[in-house]
């Protein structure tokens, strides 16, 4: 079945190497006059000139293989006789006539027209008839049919050429698609009749630089010297020994554990090793025991190990009181202390000497250049001598590093610290046998200093600053700290037998400083005045649960009229946010 082609004349194609061109017309016949192309269908490029007569292919010498084969069949005759060729227009130049002639010649080569018909057509007289639209349509139709016949004839020629090729070439090689009608323009895959296969060669270019001979360092012993491999290193040989390791033991014979009757003499070296060193702790004259290490004498090359512990350094940290220092001075002076205590006359003389010393001009203990401004009699405060007071020692300024109070003026910060409240709590943790005890430090809020603390009906808002771990050191037998109160031209003193050491609550071992466990803050703490004040420690007071209360506590505090100290009574109120068990904690400072 013939494929449809668009109605335009075929372009001139160069002769292919595989296809056979038709033989040219005999030179004896005069060349026919080709009809001129229509003026309304110009080509985009000028047609090539007609080839000279000597450029046609000769079938005989160039294609000898076709001499022995059968000639291809002639093309079928046209269906209708061609119309009369009209005369060219008058305005057509000689060049246009030559172009038309060349196109007609190229078409004759492809279609192989009959020379007799061309000869007959050349003798026809030229007519001046103009081609109509109907005639032009019929002519186009005939040209299209002629092109189809030429294409069919060309396909037959190709098939006949393939059938005449040797079997070896047809079986091994498939027809390339480039030789079909749908030809792909590819310069690298042009069809050729060359049968041999070409091998692609890409030879390296000559070296641009001069060659160099380099020596390779080789270890001559690497093939002869024996080395242990990693597998041999990982191998663990099995050692089979006797079950008793060469030492026979009889568990039923207990006589082997008895000491020998005659002791064998030891060598001096072994006897020195078995000797125990007797560490003697000398007792000094002042009664302090000092442990001396055996490395202090004779072994200076050893490094002395220093142990940091509160037990070993406790005696060194304890300072002598005034009474002990006085006794030590008397011992050095050769005075018998027992004789002075039992001698009544000596006591009376010392008392009178103390009164005489008070009348003399006082001298400062450290700076002798200071002069006294006012001298007051110092007497015991008998009205409150039965009360107990405690001195609190902080490890640092309580609110100096606080976020809110640290930025205040030092005078305002001191005013807040003077009205601070300490409240003790006991927290029941995971270990019920050893509950955790701490003191809460609270100061009035920033705008609560103007309120009257003596008014019991007025509530004062306090801020919870931090918690402290506390430790009480009683010293009732020999108090070295006294509380002095100045009132009405006299100075009254009271002993402070209790010392309260406060340390900031820090993170436990294994926790960072940001993971300090904060305890719930009570919403209210009531402070009331009492006639007598004492220090009482309640182990089960202020037990907290895991719930958290308010962030600030409102309290009331009363100050004593005598100015000796401040006493507070803390009673938790029965509300939803209070978690104390109702016991009271009374403090005085």
UniProtKB/Swiss-Prot annotation:
It comes from the Eukaryota. The keyword Transcription regulation applies. It is found in: Nucleus. Residues 126-159 form a coiled coil. GO terms for biological process: flower development; negative regulation of flower development; transcription elongation by RNA polymerase II. Residues 55-65 have a biased composition (Low complexity). Residues 1-54, 71-87 have a biased composition (Pro residues). Expressed in roots, leaves and shoot apex. Residues 88-116, 128-154 have a biased composition (Basic and acidic residues). Residues 1-180, 542-589 are annotated as: Disordered. Residues 117-127 have a biased composition (Basic residues). The keyword Coiled coil applies. GO terms for cellular component: Cdc73/Paf1 complex; nucleus. Disruption phenotype: Early flowering, reduced plant size and defects in floral morphology in whorls 1-3, but fully fertile flowers. Reduced seed dormancy and increased germination rate of freshly harvested seeds. Its main location: nucleus. Pfam families: Paf1. Keywords: Coiled coil, Flowering, Nucleus, Transcription, Transcription regulation. Component of the nuclear PAF1 complex (PAF1C), which consists of VIP2/ELF7/PAF1, VIP3/SKI8/WDR61, VIP4/LEO1, VIP5/RTF1, VIP6/ELF8/CTR9 and CDC73. Belongs to the PAF1 family. Component of the PAF1 complex (PAF1C) which is involved in histone modifications such as methylation on histone H3 'Lys-4' (H3K4me3). Involved in regulation of flowering time. Required for the expression of the flowering repressors and MAD-box genes FLC, AGL27/FLM and AGL31/MAF2. Required for histone H3 trimethylation on 'Lys-4' H3K4me3 at the FLC and AGL27/FLM loci. Involved in the control of seed dormancy and germination. This is Protein PAF1 homolog. It comes from Arabidopsis thaliana. The lineage of its organism: Eukaryota, Viridiplantae, Streptophyta, Embryophyta, Tracheophyta.
């Amino acid at each position: 079945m013939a494929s449809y082609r668009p109605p335009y004349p075929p372009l001139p194609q160069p002769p292919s190497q595989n296809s056979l061109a038709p033989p040219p017309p005999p030179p004896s016949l005069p060349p026919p006059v080709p009809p001129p192309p229509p003026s309304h269908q110009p080509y985009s490029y000028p047609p090539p000139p007609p080839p000279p007569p000597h450029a046609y292919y000769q079938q005989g010498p160039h294609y000898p293989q076709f001499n022995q084969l059968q000639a291809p069949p002639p093309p079928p005759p046209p269906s209708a006789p061609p119309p009369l060729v009209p005369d060219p227009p008058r305005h057509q130049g000689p060049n246009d006539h030559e172009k038309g002639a060349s196109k007609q010649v190229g078409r004759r080569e492809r279609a192989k027209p009959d020379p007799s018909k061309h000869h007959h057509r050349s003798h026809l007289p030229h007519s001046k008839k103009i081609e109509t639209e109907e005639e032009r349509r019929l002519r186009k139709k005939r040209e299209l049919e002629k092109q189809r016949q030429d294409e069919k004839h060309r396909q037959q020629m190709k098939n006949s050429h393939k059938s005449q090729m040797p079997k070896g070439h047809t079986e091994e090689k498939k027809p390339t698609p480039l030789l079909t009608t749908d030809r792909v323009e590819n310069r690298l895959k042009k069809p050729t009749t060359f049968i041999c296969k070409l091998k692609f060669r890409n030879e390296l270019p000559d070296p641009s630089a001069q060659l160099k001979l380099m020596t390779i360092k080789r270890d001559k012993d690497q093939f002869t010297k024996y080395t242990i491999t990693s597998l041999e290193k990982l191998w663990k040989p099995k050692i089979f020994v006797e079950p008793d390791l060469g030492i026979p033991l009889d568990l039923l014979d207990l006589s082997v554990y008895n000491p020998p009757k005659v002791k064998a003499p030891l060598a001096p070296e072994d006897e020195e090793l078995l000797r125990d060193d007797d560490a003697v702790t000398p007792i000094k004259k002042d009664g302090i025991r000092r442990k001396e290490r055996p490395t202090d004498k004779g072994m200076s090359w050893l490094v002395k190990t220093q142990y940091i512990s509160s037990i070993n350094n406790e005696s060194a940290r304890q300072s002598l009181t005034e009474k002990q220092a006085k006794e030590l001075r008397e011992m050095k002076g050769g005075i018998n202390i027992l004789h002075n205590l039992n001698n009544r006359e000596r006591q009376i003389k010392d008392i009178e000497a103390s009164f005489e010393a008070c009348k003399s001009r006082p001298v400062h203990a450290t700076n002798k250049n200071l002069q006294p401004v006012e001298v007051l009699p110092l007497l015991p405060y008998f009205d409150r001598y039965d009360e107990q007071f405690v001195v609190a020692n902080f490890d640092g300024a309580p609110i100096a590093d606080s976020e809110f109070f640290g930025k205040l003026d030092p005078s305002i910060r001191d005013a807040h610290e003077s009205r601070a409240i300490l409240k003790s709590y006991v927290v029941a943790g995971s270990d019920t046998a050893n509950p955790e005890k701490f003191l809460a430090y609270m100061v009035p809020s920033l705008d609560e200093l103007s309120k009257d603390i003596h008014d019991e009906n007025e509530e004062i808002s306090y801020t919870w600053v931090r918690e402290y771990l506390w430790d009480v050191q009683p010293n009732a037998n020999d108090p070295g700290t006294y509380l002095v109160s100045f009132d009405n031209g006299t100075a009254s003193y009271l002993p402070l037998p209790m010392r309260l050491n406060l340390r900031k609550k820090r993170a436990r071992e294994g926790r960072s400083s940001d993971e300090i466990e904060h305890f719930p803050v009570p919403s209210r703490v009531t402070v009331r005045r009492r006639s007598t004040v004492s220090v009482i420690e309640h182990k089960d007071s202020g037990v907290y649960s895991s719930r958290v209360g308010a962030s600030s506590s409102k309290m009331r505090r009363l100050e004593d009229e005598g100015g000796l100290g401040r006493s507070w009574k803390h009673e938790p109120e029965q509300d939803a946010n209070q978690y104390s068990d109702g016991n009271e904690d009374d403090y005085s400072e």
